[in-house]
From Swiss-Prot:
Residues 16-158 form the PID domain. InterPro entries: PH-like_dom_sf (IPR011993), PTB/PI_dom (IPR006020), SH2 (IPR000980), SH2_dom_sf (IPR036860), SHC_SH2 (IPR035676), Tyrosine-phos_adapter (IPR051184). SUPFAM superfamilies: PH domain-like, SH2 domain. Interacts (via PID domain) with daf-2 (via cytoplasmic domain). Interacts with mek-1; the interaction is independent of mek-1 catalytic activity and is constitutive. Interacts (via N-terminus) with mlk-1 (via NPQY motif when phosphorylated on tyrosine residue). Does not interact with jkk-1 or sek-1. Interacts (via SH2 domain) with svh-2. Interacts with svh-4. The gene is shc-1. Keywords: Cell membrane, Cytoplasm, Membrane, Nucleus, SH2 domain, Stress response. SMART domains: PTB, SH2. It comes from Caenorhabditis elegans. Expressed in hypodermis, intestine, head and tail neurons, pharynx, gonads, vulva and body muscles. Changing residue 234 to K: Weak sensitivity to Cu(2+). Severe sensitivity to Cu(2+) and no effect on the association with mek-1. Abolishes interaction with svh-2. Pfam families: PID, SH2. This is SHC-transforming protein homolog 1. GO terms for molecular function: insulin-like growth factor receptor binding; mitogen-activated protein kinase kinase binding; mitogen-activated protein kinase kinase kinase binding.
């Protein structure tokens, strides 16, 4: 059931809602959002907002997060007043009655507000491809009523999703037909839309843990794993947001297990956990090996000794 005022839903289906804003610019995002966990998506958009705003001179410049810097390109500066038109089908950015950007929701990936309590709080960034499905960018706007923008956009996405499901369930001749496979539906079914008010994610609790090393390459991780049972958790330096459990087996082999599946769930072969810390604690406290099934064979890691991250305490 669509929990939206009917007249508002019809407005979104027809002319859409227009809001005045300042279009600051955009920056290419070369990495697919689908491979990133939720907090990494937020971090990418937050860094893009800050980077674009600093480039056009409306905020102070600061160093970009090194992980994010690998997945974004050069800023395209704009900084002019626009109207943002949001309908149930797309987002349009209009300058002096001329359409300059059009992003159908089928190519919309992710959006987030600027960081609260900073000079980007009234800014909003969203990642989308253009109308022909190419040129993935984070587009950044400044808008006084940023919360209204978020509310309208969230509602438009809900209407779009509802309409797509309704159209999929009934054929033109009135007979009920199966819904299409998920890959053929609007990509909104697979995307998260966030503001600063969001629930904690499955990976946020790793920060500060003695065994968490942050961004670390496979080679550097292996150099730290000296004996059987040594383990650490790291974030891949090649794929932002991919969390990996690295350890050394009884056969003195290095193993690297991806901790999140395609739905951002923390899983092993045997069970699902609410977060990464729960997975680590469960296997350490019970003396159980972490088991994961690969294409060729099962991988098993005993978690005996956490390798402490430099600068962390040896005891949590």
């Amino acid at each position: 059931m669509l929990n939206v005022e009917p007249s508002f839903a019809e407005e979104l289906r027809s002319s859409g809602v227009s809001l005045s804003a300042t279009y600051l610019g955009s920056v290419p995002v070369v990495e697919s959002i689908n491979v990133m966990v939720s907090e990494m998506r937020v971090q990418v958009v937050s860094e893009c907002i800050q980077h674009v705003a600093a480039t056009v001179g409306v905020t102070a410049a600061r160093e970009i997060n090194p992980v994010v810097s690998r997945v974004i390109g050069e800023v395209k500066k704009e900084n002019f007043p626009v109207d943002i038109n949001i309908s149930s089908k797309m987002i349009k950015i209009i300058k002096q009655s001329r359409l300059i950007q059009r992003h159908p929701f089928s190519f919309f990936s992710f959006g987030a507000q600027g960081q609260k309590g900073t000079d980007t709080e009234l800014m909003f960034g969203y990642i989308a491809k253009n109308k022909d499905g190419t040129d993935r960018r984070c587009h950044v706007v400044f808008i006084e009523d940023v919360h209204k923008l978020i509310d309208v956009l969230t509602t438009a996405i809900n209407v779009n999703t509802f309409d797509a499901q309704a159209n999929a369930s009934t054929s033109n001749d009135g007979f009920t037909v199966p819904a299409p496979p998920m890959r053929h539906r609007s990509s909104l079914h697979r995307q998260s839309f966030v503001s600063n008010c969001r629930a904690p994610t499955v990976t946020e609790d790793v920060v500060g843990k003695v065994w968490y090393h942050g961004n670390l390459s496979r080679e550097d991780a292996q150099a730290l794993l000296k004996t059987e049972g040594d383990f650490l958790v790291r974030q891949s330096d090649h794929t932002p947001g991919k969390y990996v459990l690295s350890g050394r087996t009884a056969e003195n082999e290095h193993k690297h297990l991806i901790l999140l599946d395609n739905h951002n769930r923390v899983r092993t072969r045997d069970r699902t956990f609410s977060n990464i810390s729960e997975l680590i604690d469960y296997h350490v406290n019970n003396g159980m090996a972490v088991r994961s099934e690969g294409r060729d064979r099962e991988t098993s890691l005993n978690l005996i000794r956490p390798v402490p991250c430099p600068g962390s305490d040896d005891i949590e």
